[in-house]
Design a protein with these regions (language model features):
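Short, structured motif recognition centered on aromatic/hydrophobic residues
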Residues: 1, 15, 21, 34, ...
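N-terminal beta-strand motif that seeds the catalytic metal site of vicinal oxygen chelate
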Residues: 1-9, 55-58, 117, 122-153, ...
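Vicinal oxygen chelate
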Residues: 1-6, 50-138, 141-150, 183-185, 229-300, ...
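An N-terminus-focused feature that recognizes amino-terminal "leader" regions
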Residues: 1-100
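Core segments of cupin and vicinal oxygen chelate
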Residues: 2-41, 147-191
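Short, charged/polar, Gly/Pro-enriched secondary-structure boundary elements
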Residues: 39-45, 106-109, 118, 191-194, ...
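Structured core of small recognition/catalytic domains
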Residues: 153-246, 251-253, 257, 268-269
Length: 300
């Protein structure tokens, strides 16, 4: 995931000292590369200084160069993506060739097959359960993004029929269960790797989420938010959708972050969980059971 920030160094301080990511490099364009401690790849987050906050792109690593070639062809031929192009190897640090495209919701996505591994701060033989000297909330990995866009049907078709994602959960209209309001998609065993909400706009970014181990770590994250005087959005609380335990807060540029624990293991044959719009408050905030307009209405 690549994010735009308004002032680079305060953003880096937030993502390293508050969230607890590790800086792994900087390139000639001034971009900063970060990873969570238990990720082996060189980076999972890229920060770039810009005039407007938001998401540049979300990237997906596939299992081989052949898969990358096959999927890029399918995306180009699907009619569900525009602006398809190849980014040469080395344009990002420690990263191979990338295939870039824009979804019907206006979000830029990338596929890649090669990224150098730097390890997870632990040995591969007889390791300890976690490394010393972690900072901040100390998430173990980047988890997912929630994105806003207008053509929900098109992006869901692209992700399911072309890219092979599963729908894990969905929100539908109370009086028309064929009309989807939101869809949660997984290409793994997680409750979601990306989610989309139908909104009358293109390319909007709601939040990026990072995984913690348990509810106690979510509460500790709340303490860190208060100690560091970070802008709190809401939480700690629980989602009905995904069952996740959560707290939301903002980076200095206004990009929303989440740290998240719990959830469930998703298998490809698991039936889709459906929520109806009349119960949306409980679906999003299981304890309060009320919609929060600031949570839904603030995005970058």
């Amino acid at each position: 995931m690549a994010l735009r920030v308004l002032d680079l160094e305060p953003a880096v301080k937030h993502y390293t000292d508050v969230l607890g990511l590790l800086e792994t490099g900087r390139d000639k364009q001034g971009r900063v590369y970060l990873k969570a401690w238990d990720e082996h790849d060189h980076h999972s987050v890229v920060l770039r200084e810009a005039d407007a906050a938001g998401m540049d792109y979300m990237g997906w690593r596939v299992d081989s160069i052949q898969t990358l070639k096959d999927l890029s062809k399918k995306v180009e031929e699907s009619g569900l993506a525009t602006d398809c192009c190849w980014i040469p190897a080395g344009e990002h640090l420690e990263t191979g060739e990338r295939f870039r495209f824009t979804t019907t919701t206006g979000h830029t996505m990338e596929l890649l097959a090669e990224k150098n591994k730097v390890g997870n701060c632990l040995p591969l033989v007889n390791p300890d359960p976690w490394p010393d000297d972690l900072k901040g909330m100390g998430p173990s990995r980047f988890d997912h993004c929630l994105l806003y866009g207008d053509d929900l049907d098109g992006v869901v078709k692209l992700f399911t029929e072309v890219l092979g994602f599963d729908i894990t959960e969905q929100v539908v209209a109370e009086d028309n269960h064929d009309f989807r309001i939101s869809v949660f998609l997984s290409c793994s065993t997680k409750p979601h790797d990306v989610a989309f909400i139908r909104q009358p706009m293109k390319g909007a970014f709601h939040h990026a989420s990072f995984i913690l181990d348990n509810w106690g770590e979510v509460l500790r994250a709340a303490d860190i938010i208060s100690k560091k005087k970070v802008s709190l959005d809401l939480g700690p609380t629980r989602h009905g959708i995904t069952r996740g335990e959560t707290i939301y807060f903002f980076d200095p540029s206004g990009n929303r972050n989440e740290v998240f624990a719990g959830g469930y293991i998703h298998y490809p044959d698991k039936p889709i969980i459906t929520w109806t719009s009349d119960d949306l408050g409980r679906a999003i905030f299981y304890h309060d059971r009320k919609l929060n307009e600031n949570f839904l209405g603030v995005f970058t």
